[in-house]
């Protein structure tokens, strides 16, 4: 592994570090929201479940952004699309700070999710198409831990600034790092795989991309806008409108529909795993009576564990195989649940958060390599992002469900967190065990 990393040249390191920075700062902007559920609920005089809908619409909008921006990346290149995506979601992050009502915040977070959806798939493709195959396992773990690093940064900013600047100030702070990542991408060269295939692609292959993009945006905004107009719950509208339309996107990958459907199901389980253990954990800690500093510190410790687990299992997947690395990590998470969800002291909860973070992100550390190795080469800009973000869409209602379940149990989040982690870990182990693997596949050539 170390030998393959030493063989990477400046172009390959540049693409890897840029993709990592983009995903880290994307996640930073997303996770700022989860620390502020109670503060936003208090300002707008609603319950926490109503505010969690803002995160639900963000997740539900992401696959439509992934599809649209992925198509643009397959047509115009990875690098320019990534820069546009970062500028867009930075703008909507800033606008969120000035939301006059919860309704306005819901719509802004849907726009944010649509823009954010374009980052992961395109960024991962740029990196995976640029680096040597033998470095892919470690780089996969490294890239995916950008999400944990973003969460860690959000925890630290919450710890240091929230009591001074409030939730609106937090959104303003969130803009600056994202703009820095856009500047980083200006120094990155285009994917060699895209450059090699530029002259072999059919001129009409993406001719309807802009029309499809408008449709995708309208669908992404539908749950938030229709909820405001009709009073129906956001979750109901997500599964009634976004989910069927999102799954219809499989038609664009109809030549590979079996693997696309399998990976969408797998990524639904993975997103249930990550968001089900991360998004409400700060709220859970607050419900136990811990203050801003204690919540921020415990969450930061959990994300240090996540970074360690992702790097370790990403690298080990080169020996264990992609599937077994994910299975082992999911199995470990089950053993950690009692310490993570039912401890009574901050020290034990922080230790549990470290171990759960390592287990959950250990399984996630394999995902960028696994998806890109299984993706068809002619749509690698769109395919990994689509199946990943479809998982986000299908899992998006979980956070509202967990908050509602906790409310029904007198505000105790322990049961909701524990049942989610246990059931989903078993589900992942089963899905991955019977799935395919193409470890070490050549991503620089066209697949038949």
How does the language model describe each region?
Residues 45, 77, 98-104, 132, ...:
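Helix-breaking motifs and short loop linkers at transmembrane-helix boundaries and internal kinks
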Residues 143-186, 204-208, 224-236:
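Helix-loop-helix hairpin linking two adjacent transmembrane segments in secondary transporters
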């Amino acid at each position: 592994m170390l030998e393959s990393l030493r063989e990477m040249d400046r172009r390959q390191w540049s693409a890897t570090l840029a993709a990592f920075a983009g995903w880290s700062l994307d996640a930073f902007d997303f996770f700022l929201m989860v620390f502020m559920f109670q503060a936003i609920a208090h300002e707008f005089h609603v319950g926490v479940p109503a505010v969690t809908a803002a995160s639900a619409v963000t997740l539900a909008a992401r696959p439509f952004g992934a599809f649209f921006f992925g198509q643009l990346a397959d047509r115009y290149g990875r690098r320019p699309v990534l820069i546009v995506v970062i500028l867009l979601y930075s703008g909507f992050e800033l606008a969120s700070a000035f939301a006059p009502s919860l309704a306005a915040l819901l719509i802004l977070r849907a726009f944010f999710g649509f823009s954010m959806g374009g980052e992961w798939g395109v960024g991962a493709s740029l990196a995976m198409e640029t680096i040597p195959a033998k470095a892919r396992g470690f780089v996969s773990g490294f890239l995916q831990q950008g999400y944990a690093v973003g969460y860690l940064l959000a925890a630290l900013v919450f710890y240091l600034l929230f009591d001074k600047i409030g939730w609106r100030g937090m959104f303003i702070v969130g803009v600056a790092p994202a703009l820095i990542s856009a500047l980083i991408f200006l120094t990155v060269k285009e994917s060699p795989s895209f450059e090699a295939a530029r002259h072999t692609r059919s001129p009409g292959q993406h001719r309807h991309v802009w029309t499809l993009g408008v449709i995708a945006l309208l669908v992404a905004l539908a749950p938030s806008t229709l909820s405001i107009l009709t009073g129906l719950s956001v979750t109901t509208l997500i599964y009634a409108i976004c989910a069927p339309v999102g799954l219809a996107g499989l038609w664009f990958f109809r030549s590979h529909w079996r693997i696309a459907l399998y990976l969408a199901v797998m990524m639904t389980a993975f997103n249930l795993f990550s968001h089900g253990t991360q998004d409400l954990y700060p709220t859970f800690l607050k419900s136990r009576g811990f203050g801003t500093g204690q919540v921020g510190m415990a969450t930061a410790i959990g994300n240090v564990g996540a970074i360690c687990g992702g790097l370790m299992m990403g690298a080990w997947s080169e020996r264990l195989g992609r599937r077994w690395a994910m299975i082992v990590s999911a199995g470990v998470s089950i053993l950690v649940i009692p310490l993570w969800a039912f401890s009574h002291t901050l020290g034990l909860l922080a230790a549990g958060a470290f171990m759960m973070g390592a287990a959950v992100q250990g399984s996630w550390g394999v995902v960028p390599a696994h998806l890109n190795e299984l993706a068809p080469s002619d749509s690698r800009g769109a395919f990994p992002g689509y199946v990943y973000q479809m998982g986000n869409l299908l899992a998006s209602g979980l956070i509202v469900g967990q908050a509602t379940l906790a409310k029904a149990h007198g505000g105790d989040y322990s049961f909701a967190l524990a049942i989610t982690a246990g059931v989903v870990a078993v589900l992942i182990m089963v899905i991955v065990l019977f799935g395919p693997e193409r470890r070490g596949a050549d991503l620089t050539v066209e697949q038949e």
